Amino acid sequence: MISVEHVSKRYLTRQGWRTVLHDISFKMEKGEKIGILGRNGAGKSTLIRLISGVEPPTTGEIKRTMSISWPLAFSGAFQGSLTGMDNLRFICRIYNVDIDYVKNFTEEFSELGQYLYEPVKRYSSGMKARLAFALSLAVEFDCYLIDEVIAVGDSRFADKCKYELFEKRKDRSIILVSHSHSAMKQYCDNAMVLEKGHMYQFEDMDKAYEYYNSLP
């Protein structure tokens, strides 16, 4: 289970303190799939980072009783001076997983070839996303966080990502940030709308989208 309890997040900017999330609360059970809708700047990516543990909330608490992925295709944690393979080994040590399995899976899934042995700072954004997506799937989690990344690469690679995530791991929990109504209806059980840092929850996907589309 993931329990988000009265979570707020604020950052210090040149104009002073800016609150990005206001008193967010919800619970997610094992196997549940939740969609998050919101305009740019609504706080979606911030919420994903907090749930993953990349950042702590300013106030409130997030309780986790299941393993949670980092945001899929999030490459910000890579050390640019290290090769893709060195980053892979580092992640394997952190999560205590078999290096040979992760290496073989990543080589086959990412299709990066010899670029895996090049420094990550030489990668294009798409190559970094492929590596991050492959590593996210090579390390098994109870819950996967997806922040608008299913369109990584060409359509064939995107289809491969969808199969690995939504078919082979259909028993896992998913939090999906997307603007796509069809993706939400296909992959999620219910939806939440973030508006200016405030959360609105809907059990009916169409009602969530109706509210989302009514926003200015």
From Swiss-Prot:
Subcellular location: Cell inner membrane
Reaction it catalyzes: ATP + H2O + capsular polysaccharide-[capsular polysaccharide-binding protein]Side 1 = ADP + phosphate + capsular polysaccharideSide 2 + [capsular polysaccharide-binding protein]Side 1
Domain ABC transporter: 2-215
EC numbers, comma separated: 7.6.2.12
Major enzyme class: translocase
GO cellular component: a single term: plasma membrane
Gene3D superfamilies assigned to the protein according to its UniProt record, in alphabetical order: P-loop containing nucleotide triphosphate hydrolases
Domain of life: Bacteria
PROSITE patterns: ABC_TRANSPORTER_1, ABC_TRANSPORTER_2
Main subcellular location: membrane
Topology class, membrane: Peripheral membrane protein
CDD domains noted in UniProt: ABC_KpsT_Wzt
Residue sites binding ATP per the record: G38, R39, N40, G41, A42, G43, K44, S45
GO molecular function: ABC-type capsular-polysaccharide transporter activity; ATP binding; ATP hydrolysis activity
Keyword Ribonucleoprotein on entry: no
Keywords attached to this entry: ATP-binding, Capsule biogenesis/degradation, Cell inner membrane, Cell membrane, Membrane, Nucleotide-binding, Polysaccharide transport, Sugar transport, Translocase, Transport
Function: Putative ATP-binding protein, and an energy-coupling component of capsule polysaccharide export apparatus.
Family of this protein: Belongs to the ABC transporter superfamily.
Matching PANTHER family: TEICHOIC ACIDS EXPORT ATP-BINDING PROTEIN TAGH
The protein's name: Capsule polysaccharide export ATP-binding protein CtrD
Gene that encodes the chain: ctrD
